[in-house]
């Protein structure tokens, strides 16, 4: 077997006939598959055991040799080798063709490679291949040249002879007519009509003679003419002409029909000469001919550089794939189901055998040609059914699946079996909430856990002597004996499992948890993990996967634990936020009410306050004063205040003051609920003495995530969750429909606006308003009415009611929903997305009328339809993004570049003060500085050095110092040859530390952009015909448009030169006339610079004014600019920044946070190539797309040797095009256009370096990222006690030192190699062997390289 790690490159090329015979184990001669009586494969058939190997392990076909001891013997009776039956998945056969056939990929693909090579149009090529035309394959030029004078004489004499015969025949006929006339005269019958009839007949005969001879002369003339000019590659459609030419001059040339002709032509090609001729043609040809020559040169060059033989595109032998890859299965009714490939192979074999027989019989050429054409068609449909003509169909008119179809599309080999495999040791079940679970735990149903951990349990049962051997241990497990469950508990402890919820839109869709055994059949999920998985408990299912090896377990525990994945990689915010019930509980606790029991009481300690609460002396929401120890961290900017005492006793003050005592303790005013809330936060975190709703809680959690270790954050979140769940029922929040009160003024307001609407309609009836103006006025009216009613609802809404608590805390719902229940629904849109000017005046509390209900349906239905479409569209976008960026991996620490991007950190607010830019967390945050930052106050002090990271604190400090812009390192300016470097990327947003080498930042970027894709709108916004000329594309279509580098709809022009603007309006629209400056470099006509006119619509708002002087690249009107124009006019960097900003704008407008660096990674991939304009002294071809790094390297070497470097211009490619243009043919073929990619790769004999992720997944190697990198793969890690104590489950609990064994010491840790959890070298799967368990295998050996 092939060792999967024994190679680091894969090459694809053209197989010659000898290669195919070399792979084969025998020729398939018969179309038969299996014998229907014996059900055994037929000899020499498509399933023949002699060729492909035995159907049963270690047994020949006739049964003479059975058992493994005869291994390798070939049976002399039946000719079958005694070996394993699985060789039937590997061994190939072949079919020797009676006539050559062309490979349809090379002839029918677009462009036709065969056509380019032979310089023949695809149409002509098809006529030759399918026996409609003859092709000249070779001409003996020298002999023809030498013999031409003699042949000319022969030709002349033949023409002369024919002319003489023509003249003599005509003369004879004339003489005959004279004789006939004379005879008539003698007979006395020479009347007018008789003479005329005789003459006419004679003239007809003479004309026929003349025509016959002239045709012969013309044919001879045509044959000789054709022969004189004959050259290889010429085609002749006229069969008679060809035969005549063959008869006369057959010694001087050769030619034929079909693939045979193509093969002979390919064998006689002189590629070196063709290459030289084409290079000459490129230098001084017209643009059209130059383009064609370039395309031809590309194909010719491919053959020259690789040493591939062109004639390999024509096949003499066809490989037959192994029978177990095209199986035949018996169904219940005795019938057979077979793979389509078998039918296609049978057609080929039948036609091939018939052709052989016809050749042996010496059949006429026309029959042979017909049979050869049918053979060609059979091979075509085997390779790519339906590519030419009508596809071959099977039963029920379904086109048969050919070899190409096996590779193509979602169900093809690449995407179905190589990139998406089924996984062993996995299960799936419905999820339910596990409120008592810690963040790192999940509940695993006992039956599922037992099945997943079965081998581990069996081994442990044998180790503990509960069973003598594996068989009895397995019986114990199947019976479910009591001891099994104890062993299962032991086996699963500290063995993490992976949970996954589909669709896995980002990397948080798979996380590791420690399993806890639970009853029932549902998986229990901790509520804090829901947001990351986007899971809820309405019937969602999740899959469980079991990491088996020690390395896999270590990776799951150290990198994938849910308690470590608290931050979202897209924006760096916390993803594990308490929600719903938890928020309600925390909001209730942190609320302080005026005038409740115990307000103003003073307590000497927390314990005293707790006692008072237990005795119902104080309310949890009462403001009390508690003396707190000096370790207590006060809120920022705290000043002592005072609290009014609710029921002061005699002699007590009515007001109590907060104060700080000399011993450092503080008398602090707060509620007991807030004390409880703050106890969940880290001890040194400033006291939060305010009401905590969802937004505030989010800020607190984000802040804690920034300041503390992951373990502390996880502990805090768990404590918040427990407190929220425990206290939510205490709040007693419940609500009924009656809690929603309609404002009494509602009906009056609606009536008032109805009157106004009637007035608008009356004006329309009188012709004072147009239809459009009426519509717009009504829409404005009812929008205003809805807002007024909503305002009334909010004003009359009781802020202490249960419903208000639910909404204000952010637990569920919002004011908009309350308005629809108590106020009015307002205006709704129709399916086109246009607003219907008739509003829904009712609310849900009163119920809708029939018409209102009907027009409301549009929105609901459109919402569902849109969601379905968006999901598909967003998924496809994510797939393309992943594909284009999958090989962007952090390859090195520092590329050493001095370049960077200027990024704004501050802006002016309305008062003119410098404040941090709005999207700071999505722009400058987490980047490294590309240059020192100097204090603008003195121009000398270095505030921060190059390579310092921009945290939020640093950014705020920069703003405080008056710094407005800094130069940051960026992926766009990174100079790593492959991938990016850590310093140009900056911090990983998932950890807030510098990104590790090996991090797959490309995939993370694609997931970050794709995951919120479903939240983006799908429609183009219609602005009511006022603001913009056309619908401005927004949402998901706009993102797609940008990433595919398409020219936007309603494109806004930008100026190519600096100059002055003049705006002219006329009937046809508006013209903006630019008069370029004299020094702008604009082209001149007769020494004068010609003005440039831009035609724009009158309805589009202008961005320039008449008489303005503008810079190069100024946008003239509102709208989207074509990034390709920006690239041409302003250069690569401006185009890159434009795409990043535009994509960011779309996401921000939908309220989605995403960091610019993710978009930059994608844009970096879109602009990483150069189009060659002039090849200089390099081997590059004009028009070729070359990687930036390779382009620079080639030029560097050329210049070093004194040559002329190539000239190129930056290219901007859409993500689909960029994915297909990748260096890895495996990656491109598994993306789209599989057959085209493979055709091109085979011709160029491309080598895949296996540097990306997809390529390695396809061939089953570890991916070259993360722990798959050699630097990590070879590391041996053993945790010590200190490390184990800091892991979150044991965090702050004294670790796991107390194992109940008094003699336990740290030294014993070295013996804990968990060998009982491992299988050593045993790999579970098909070859699971019980014998391997009898001796203890010990731990896995370390991987060595």
Curated annotation (Swiss-Prot):
Entry note: cofactor: Binds 1 Mg(2+) ion per subunit. Binds 2 Zn(2+) ions per subunit.
Residues where Zn(2+) 2 binds: 895, 974, 981, 984
Highest rank taxon of the organism: Bacteria
Binding site for Mg(2+): 536, 538, 540
Enzyme class: transferase
Cofactors that this protein relies on: Mg(2+); Zn(2+)
Biological-process GO terms, alphabetical: DNA-templated transcription
GO cellular component: DNA-directed RNA polymerase complex
Keyword Transferase among record annotations: yes
One term of GO molecular function: DNA-directed RNA polymerase activity
Catalytic activity of the protein: RNA(n) + a ribonucleoside 5'-triphosphate = RNA(n+1) + diphosphate
InterPro entries in the record: DNA-dir_RpoC_beta_prime, DNA-dir_RpoC_beta_prime_bact, RNA_pol_asu, RNA_pol_N, RNA_pol_Rpb1_1, RNA_pol_Rpb1_3, RNA_pol_Rpb1_3_sf, RNA_pol_Rpb1_4
EC number in record: 2.7.7.6
Pfam families: RNA_pol_Rpb1_1 (PF04997), RNA_pol_Rpb1_2 (PF00623), RNA_pol_Rpb1_3 (PF04983), RNA_pol_Rpb1_4 (PF05000), RNA_pol_Rpb1_5 (PF04998)
Keyword annotations: DNA-directed RNA polymerase, Magnesium, Metal-binding, Nucleotidyltransferase, Transcription, Transferase, Zinc
Positions with a binding annotation for Zn(2+) 1: 60, 62, 75, 78
Family the UniProt entry places it in: Belongs to the RNA polymerase beta' chain family.
Function comment: DNA-dependent RNA polymerase catalyzes the transcription of DNA into RNA using the four ribonucleoside triphosphates as substrates.
Record's subunit section: The RNAP catalytic core consists of 2 alpha, 1 beta, 1 beta' and 1 omega subunit. When a sigma factor is associated with the core the holoenzyme is formed, which can initiate transcription.
Protein name as catalogued: DNA-directed RNA polymerase subunit beta'
Chain's gene name: rpoC
